[in-house]
Amino acid sequence: MIPDVSQALAWLEKHPQALQGIQRGLERETLRVNADGTLATTGHPPALGSALTHKWITTDFAEALLEFITPVDGDIEHMLTFMRDVHRYTARQLGDERMWPLSMPCYIAPGQDIELAQYGTSNVGRLKTLYREGLKNRYGALMQTISGVHYNFSLPMAFWQAKCGVEDAESGKEAISAGYFRSIRNYYRFGWVIPYLFGASPAICSSFLQGKPTTLPFEETGNGMYYLPYATSLRLSDLGYTNKSQSNLGITFNDLHEYVAGLKRAIKTPSEEYAKIGLQKDGKYLQINSNILQIENELYAPIRPKRVTRRGETPSDALLRGGIEYIEVRSLDINPFSPIGVDAQQVRFLDLFMVWCALADAPEMSSDELLCTRTNWNRVILEGRKPGLTLGIGCESAQFPLAQVGKDLFRDLRRVAQTLDSIHGGQAYQQVCDELLACFDDPELTFSARILRSMIEEGIGGTGRALADRYRTQLREEPLEILSEDDFIAERDASVARQKKVEAEDSEPFEALLARHA
């Protein structure tokens, strides 16, 4: 089932310098909660500066949903320590509040009023909040309080020079973009390995179902918890953050222009369903527009091609201008075993897997075939640890045992690990292979199995509260290592000044900005 990568691996072993200088970044979301686990109703803490313009600390959907961002980094330990410093400083600013350590929220009542993230009075700030109002009216607020980790990854220019013969980013943008699209197609085919190993949302609180009927064969505990015994990541299931209306958009990952055209079509195509919501009620805006996507960011995807945007530029225009610069991997649940929601083992695994995705052959995929890859993901998400579970290839009927496919994949990953270890010294990447390979013989070693044991005993709420308390104490007591308190104070003040500048420079009415998004 795994493509034959032997030639590409032999090439890599002859050109180890092609992997010198991999760049990464991390984003981690977490809900602010009270000591009893309920959602915090306070505003974004002033000590954390402006959520609109702060470089490292912002908010996602809700005012209580923090998002931490590291700068681009070539050093894994440095990046994780930076992320930990942001957590340490934030933990000291939250008073009695905690950071929820799980992807799925628990103590949110159906119909509870969840305050949307606020970004000030500028047009761009108001548009961000209105976009969230649209998400709430389209999908419900509860779905938007789910948290995850995003891992951003780029291969060094040396890789593309050696592999494709390009000279630089500008002249080589078509070849580099084609290479990243190959990675994305392989990710759709084999990325289910991420929820298998690291999925950590095998259960949900009953409030999450909001009384809606479900066909999933949930088992129920006495404390209002529903779980599937072999599930890995309900966050990635239809109960979590997905969007059924997007499944037939026909967006494909074969070619940059084709991908962008599909995206632009979706933000210009009216939706009958969303038109029913309306654009305004009693003078209050309800969504940016009633198209299938209000803006490009609304496209739900487990992985995205990205380029840093310039001011006033949409993500797709940035891609057309400069090609794909990096890839954003979006399938990681919050790691409940780490105070910062992610650890070095996961980052090293993702390095290995994304390099493999860039090396393995990946035929072009139609939109139908993309939908077929979803079958494997759904199996792994809902019953990934089930003994004897099998997976298919694309739309073909042949089935292969997940455990065997996983072991075959790790045989390749070990060779990538040897190359990366030869560059960095030590055995860190090979050690990750040893640790994770064991999960295919014993699914009880996976994140989902480990956290489910605790949840069955303590409930989701009990597990979440205990971890939140432990990490709060731990982070508050640890000294800062890379950033200083002065750095955080300076960025707080600078971010507030930047927001005021944006607000002062607004020259057009908000309605004119909205008209451009119609």
Curated annotation (Swiss-Prot):
ATP-binding listed as a keyword: yes
GO biological process, one term: glutathione biosynthetic process
Main enzyme class: ligase
Annotated keywords: ATP-binding, Glutathione biosynthesis, Ligase, Nucleotide-binding
Pfam families: Glu_cys_ligase
Recorded GO MF terms: ATP binding; glutamate-cysteine ligase activity; metal ion binding
GO cellular component, one term: cytosol
Pathway(s) served: Sulfur metabolism; glutathione biosynthesis; glutathione from L-cysteine and L-glutamate: step 1/2
Gene3D superfamilies in alphabetical order: 3.30.590.20
Entry EC no(s): 6.3.2.2
Origin superkingdom: Bacteria
Known catalytic reactions: L-cysteine + L-glutamate + ATP = gamma-L-glutamyl-L-cysteine + ADP + phosphate + H(+)
NCBIfam families: glu_cys_ligase
Family assignment from sequence similarity: Belongs to the glutamate--cysteine ligase type 1 family. Type 1 subfamily.
Protein's name according to its UniProt entry: Glutamate--cysteine ligase
Source organism of this protein record: Klebsiella pneumoniae subsp. pneumoniae (strain ATCC 700721 / MGH 78578)
